[in-house]
């Protein structure tokens, strides 16, 4: 099994239900297994999604760095994917994960606990 997400192809039955944006990406919402707390939002392309399905490791595409990002590979804050679903329109992916360490790139538990508006 390769550690390069670009070498993974998404099953056609899944890919044909997926609605990617003009950049070839789909938003991915990540929830904590057991609590359903929203941990983060990231972007995936078909290779990141295929790699995630094959390895059960949260894998995303960084728009700012223009590269794949396997969550925890450098930080140790690994995501073990326990569930993955498409929404009714196929334009959003929902991942359920067992999170080790912080989910946010800042090291925080969630990306949504620092700037609460209501």
UniProtKB/Swiss-Prot annotation:
Biological or metabolic pathway of the protein: Amino-acid biosynthesis; L-histidine biosynthesis; L-histidine from 5-phospho-alpha-D-ribose 1-diphosphate: step 3/9
A GO MF term: phosphoribosyl-AMP cyclohydrolase activity
Binding residue positions for Mg(2+): 87, 89, 91
The protein's Enzyme Commission number: 3.5.4.19
Highest taxon of source: Bacteria
UniProt cofactor note: Binds 1 Mg(2+) ion per subunit.
GO-annotated cellular components: cytoplasm
Cofactor requirement: Mg(2+); Zn(2+)
Recorded catalytic activity of this chain's protein: 1-(5-phospho-beta-D-ribosyl)-5'-AMP + H2O = 1-(5-phospho-beta-D-ribosyl)-5-[(5-phospho-beta-D-ribosylamino)methylideneamino]imidazole-4-carboxamide
Function: Catalyzes the hydrolysis of the adenine ring of phosphoribosyl-AMP.
Name of the protein: Phosphoribosyl-AMP cyclohydrolase
Annotated organism of origin: Corynebacterium glutamicum (strain ATCC 13032 / DSM 20300 / JCM 1318 / BCRC 11384 / CCUG 27702 / LMG 3730 / NBRC 12168 / NCIMB 10025 / NRRL B-2784 / 534)
Gene name of the record: hisI
């Amino acid at each position: 099994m390769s550690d390069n997400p670009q070498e993974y192809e998404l099953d056609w039955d899944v890919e044909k239900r997926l609605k990617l944006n003009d950049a070839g990406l789909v938003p991915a919402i990540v929830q904590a297994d057991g609590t359903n707390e929203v941990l983060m939002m990231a972007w995936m392309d078909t290779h990141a999604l295929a790699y995630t399905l094959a390895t059960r490791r949260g894998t995303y595409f960084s728009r700012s760095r223009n590269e794949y990002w396997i969550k925890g590979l450098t930080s140790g804050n690994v995501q073990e994917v326990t569930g993955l679903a498409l929404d009714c329109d196929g334009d959003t992916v929902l991942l359920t994960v067992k999170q080790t360490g912080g989910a946010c790139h800042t090291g925080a538990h969630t990306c949504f606990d620092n700037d609460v508006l209501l």
